[in-house]
């Protein structure tokens, strides 16, 4: 083996060994090939690119360091959740959100469901905040609020009734920020319960048995070319004057949201493409909660018919 190949092989085998130490080792093991240790050290420094800028092209051990790091460092992890795509055989969707059981508005909720029956929708999309979970909120608790058990019982009755009303429909339940409170409370306040069977919200509500698809709090849904989010996922603390406009400015694409309890619509454009629209839907809950009795909320929902969105407002139980 030639001296160059010999030294490069040692540099590869011992990339972290100091130049002088490596040179002494090479000379000790191959004294017949070199005059002294200093000659070996000169060549080691040369092939490691330590003698100046012109010799950097020989610094192959630096490439080896990179490969070594690639092999030793654990693979990077991503918390990205894969989006849910509405099946292509679905044609008409009823989107309802912000029911906040048991603080729902009877007239508004039943009017929306009746409209869905009339329109013969094949999909029901609960776009977040089916439940309220006031007692396990991070905000100041109102001890006069209903118990968590009562809220869960109401949700069970609602979901069972919904399945009976729409036996053949695809029903999707997307968690909103209020729905998320339950599982989050278990994980943070009572992690000892996590190994108990059927302790999480989806299990307590028997979603699998009711053939209801559950989407995570941060999971996107796509219906045709429209993204559907609850609204808390967006980088905006409030909806401003027009929540639909605020949402459009945040992500610049066709979108339907709830969360802000207000009905609005806004148009956007991507150069070279047709105009698109963003929508924020009204809620189906009580419009005068004790924590915010004065507000600009409205009751509402929407129908998506083959990608065409029609928003509806409910006033005193009448659809407009």
Regions inferred by a protein language model and the residue ranges of each:
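Positively charged, polyanion-binding regions of nucleic-acid-associated proteins
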Residues: 1-16
């Amino acid at each position: 083996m030639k001296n160059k190949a010999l030294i490069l092989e040692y540099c590869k085998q011992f990339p972290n060994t100091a130049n002088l130490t490596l040179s002494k080792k090479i000379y000790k093991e191959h004294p017949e090939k070199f005059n002294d240790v200093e000659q070996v050290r000169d060549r080691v420094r040369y092939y490691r690119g330590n003698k100046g800028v012109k010799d950097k092209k020989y610094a192959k051990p630096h490439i080896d360091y990179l490969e070594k790091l690639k092999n030793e460092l654990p693979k990077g992890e991503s918390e990205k959740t894969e989006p849910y795509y509405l099946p292509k055989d679905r044609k008409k969707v009823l989107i309802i959100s912000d029911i906040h059981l048991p603080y729902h508005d009877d007239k508004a909720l039943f009017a929306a469901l009746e409209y869905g029956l009339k329109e013969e929708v094949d999909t029901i999309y609960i776009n977040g905040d089916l439940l309220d979970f006031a007692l396990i909120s991070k905000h100041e608790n109102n001890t006069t609020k209903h118990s968590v058990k009562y809220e869960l019982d109401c949700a069970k009755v609602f979901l069972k009734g919904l399945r009976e009303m729409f036996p053949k429909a695809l029903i999707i339940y997307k968690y909103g920020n209020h729905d998320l409170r339950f599982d989050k409370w278990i994980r943070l306040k009572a992690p000892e319960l996590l190994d108990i069977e059927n302790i999480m919200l989806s299990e307590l509500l028997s979603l699998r048995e009711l053939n209801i698809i559950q989407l995570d709090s941060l999971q996107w849904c796509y219906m045709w070319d429209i993204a559907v989010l609850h609204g808390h996922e967006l980088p905006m603390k409030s909806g401003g004057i027009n929540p639909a406009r605020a949402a459009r400015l945040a992500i610049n694409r066709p979108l339907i949201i709830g969360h802000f309890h207000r009905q609005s619509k806004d148009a956007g454009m991507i150069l070279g493409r047709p105009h698109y629209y963003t929508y924020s839907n009204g809620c189906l809950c009580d419009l005068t909660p004790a924590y915010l009795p004065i507000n600009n909320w409205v009751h509402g929902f929407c129908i998506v018919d083959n990608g065409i969105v029609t928003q509806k407002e409910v006033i005193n139980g009448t659809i407009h």
